[in-house]
């Protein structure tokens, strides 16, 4: 069982956090030149079999009608600056803990190791 990386992004129209961040940067901080902001959630998942991963992916990690997923790598994002924010070692990661609890409920097995981060992409 290897570590799987899953990126989840809200589809256009459902990307409220990205829209809010874009508005804040333009209006509150008066940052000029930003054309688009994308917020992408990253999950590193360890301890699941292929079947368990396939079973829990659309139930726990994303909503198929609302989200777009990328497995293992993000596609090329032209003219973008990307930075990721994640919990430091020892800090509680509520998103990862909630996902691990949900996976445990679905699979009825031991809780997997999950880490999460948020990637912010800014197009200039």
Regions inferred by a protein language model and the residue ranges of each:
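Non-catalytic terminal accessory/regulatory regions of metabolic enzymes
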Residues: 1-124
